[in-house]
Swiss-Prot record:
GO terms for cellular component: catalytic step 2 spliceosome; cytoplasm. The keyword ATP-binding applies. Belongs to the DEAD box helicase family. DDX23/PRP28 subfamily. ATP binds at residues 212-219. SUPFAM superfamilies: P-loop containing nucleoside triphosphate hydrolases. One of its GO terms (molecular function) is ATP binding. A motif (Q motif) lies at residues 168-196. This is Pre-mRNA-splicing ATP-dependent RNA helicase PRP28. Residues 424-575 form the Helicase C-terminal domain. The lineage of its organism: Eukaryota, Fungi, Dikarya, Ascomycota, Saccharomycotina.
């Protein structure tokens, strides 16, 4: 009730009561009772305030009675005398006159709350607003709000029914203890975002569609569920069938390089578990594959689609017991023309009917085939593949897949029609040497669109004392593998490559990507610069571009604007011209 008194506008009576310097005003008898009641309420409020203070009553309380007395006197004088006395203040020479020093006096220190409480108020408006962060809670203490914050922290978005909560720590999920131990031995401290999201869903034997960029930790995101599945298979079956040519798990990749990288990662686990992993890729003799299977058998195959189809047709491998499938970079497999081969492979896999009508259901502890698909984008073809071969999948979107890469600085050099090839190459030399001066342990990838351009660049760089290696489609598999090994080990600090050869290469410490020739499809630009700035590191890209690349300008403009990047002048001018047209 007291708050209403102080919030309303002051009447003439109140103004008179508070300021002795104003001219007394006659107060009708009918209003005097109301004024006295108002004074009484003020006195009560002042009394309440004083009980909560440890010091003497404030001056304003004393002034109330003084003011009241003055007001009464002034009123009496106004009644008895025809000319009321007017109180005036001595002029100070200031434009504005106050009863206090504006610069020195501060009333904030005199604030005393009406009620002081040490205990928290049980207010329903604040219920559920917990102050404890999820990192300080046990798993069973996590609330829905905690999980929402968790997903925001790790840029995880999900779509689908009954998606389980992400994985916080390796030892909190339903991962086999043997795998948890190996993960610790190999030095994987915490899961990445894609691993946190996909592993719990896959361990529920749900189909998974993961939308994430290369370099986000996808390999371990599908290896852990695959190996966890193999560990759940009947031990007697694995013991007696391990020397057969019937793998129980299959991982498909678009390129030989990516398949070899996945194989290398899988071998770290399989050697400790006693499992056999085998790559089936082009460039290797069929007889070598046959000999390997005859000697050790195979549990897990990592393959490219085309080579695997040939191996199936030659009866080298049999997929009739393969109930666990992974498709890595599915969008790239389709873009590279493997859709037909991919469908052939998937049609060779066992069905749910085989699980329910044979002993396989008890051996493999499954009711349906388990499929995981990872892709950078969901194209119509990928969506069609998903609907045909996956059952009720959960969709996982990790980070900014398909969006601008915030941790990569993107620079451009616009070349006029008068720019010679020699001028362009000299600029390339300056960029490389400048990067070397300011970067510790630099690794540079140079992309070109044609094999002969790669070879020419290699020769010119070598003549300028820049050690480099080259990979493209005309290089043998052994030469490509050796080139990547030399680059990875810093024996050569520059790798020159075409898009197809470099697709899927995962070298974590690439510091600079140079597009010597701009791509014809914009998606390839994203894949190229995505070779740097991996695993949270910062990266740089430099692109030579000219009027011959105008078909890329519009998607490039949208890409840069979406990521909050500054548009180069030449691209901004192109935008203006487009709008005017």
């Amino acid at each position: 009730m007291s708050s209403n008194i102080f919030k309303r506008f002051k009447s003439a009576e109140e103004s008179l009561d508070e300021d002795e310097s104003v001219t007394p005003v006659y107060i009708p008898k009918a209003k005097r009772a109301k004024l006295e009641a108002l004074k009484a309420k003020k006195s009560q409020i002042a009394s309440r305030l004083s009980t909560h203070k440890q010091q003497s009553a404030p001056t304003t309380t004393t002034n109330t009675s003084t003011t009241a007395s003055t007001t009464t006197t002034a009123t009496t004088n106004n009644t008895n005398n025809s000319k009321p006395s007017i109180q005036t203040k001595k002029p100070t020479g200031k434009k504005f006159q106050f009863d206090w020093d504006v610069e020195e006096e501060d009333t904030a220190s005199g604030f005393v709350p009406l009620i002081e409480m040490d205990e928290e108020i049980d207010d329903p408006l604040f219920s559920g607003q917990e102050s404890t962060h999820w990192t300080n809670k046990n798993l069973e203490e996590m609330t829905d709000r905690d999980w929402r914050i968790f997903k925001e922290d790790y840029n995880i978005t999900t779509k689908g029914k009954n998606i389980p909560n992400p994985l916080r720590y390796w030892n909190e999920g339903s991962i086999n203890d043997k795998l948890v131990s190996i993960i610790s031995q190999l030095g994987y401290e915490e899961p990445t975002s894609v691993q946190r999201a996909s592993i719990p869903l896959a361990l529920k034997k749900r189909d998974v569609v993961g939308v994430a960029e290369t370099g986000s930790g996808k390999t371990l995101a599908f290896l852990i569920p695959v190996l966890n599945y193999i560990l759940s298979i009947d031990e007697n079956y694995l013991k007696y069938e391990k020397i057969s040519n019937e793998p129980v798990g299959l991982i498909l990749a678009p390129t030989r390089e990516l398949a070899l990288q996945i194989t290398k990662e899988a071998e770290k686990f399989c050697k400790k578990l006693g499992y056999q992993v085998l790559p089936i890729i082009g460039g290797h003799h069929y007889q070598d594959t046959i000999n390997k299977i005859d000697q050790t058998g195979v549990h897990l195959i990592v393959a490219t689609p085309g080579r695997l189809v040939d191996s199936i047709e030659r009866k080298i491998v049999d997929l009739s017991k393969c109930y666990c499938l992974v498709m890595d970079e599915a969008d790239r497999m389709i873009d590279m023309g493997f859709e037909k081969d991919l469908n052939k492979v998937l049609d060779k896999l066992p069905t749910e009917k085989q699980l329910s009508s044979t002993i396989d259901g008890r051996i493999f502890h499954l009711e349906k085939r388990s499929t995981m698909m990872f892709t950078a984008t969901i194209s119509p073809t990928v969506e069609k593949l998903t609907k045909k071969y996956l059952i009720d999948p959960g969709y996982l979107y990790i980070g900014g897949a398909g969006e601008a890469l915030d941790n990569i600085s993107q620079s451009f050099e616009f070349l006029s029609s008068a720019t010679t090839e020699a001028t362009k190459f000299n600029k390339l030399i300056k960029i490389i040497r400048s990067h070397w001066r300011v970067t510790e342990n630099p690794l540079i990838i140079i992309f070109a669109n044609f094999k002969h351009v790669c070879d020419s660049l290699s020769q010119e760089l070598s003549s300028n004392d820049i050690n480099n290696v080259v990979i493209h489609g005309s290089k043998s598999q052994d030469m490509r593998e050796q080139a990547i090994t030399n680059f990875r080990n810093h024996e050569s600090e520059v790798l020159i490559a075409t898009d197809v050869a470099a697709r899927g290469i995962d070298i974590p410490n690439v510091t600079l990507v140079i597009n010597y020739q701009m791509v014809k499809k914009f998606d390839e630009y994203i894949h190229r610069i995505g070779r740097t700035g991996r695993a949270g590191n910062l990266g740089e890209s430099f692109t030579f571009i000219s009027d011959q690349d105008t078909e890329i300008f519009t998607p490039l403009k949208k890409f840069l604007k979406k990521g909050g990047k500054r548009l180069p002048d030449w691209l901004y001018k192109h935008q203006s011209q487009t709008v005017q047209e």
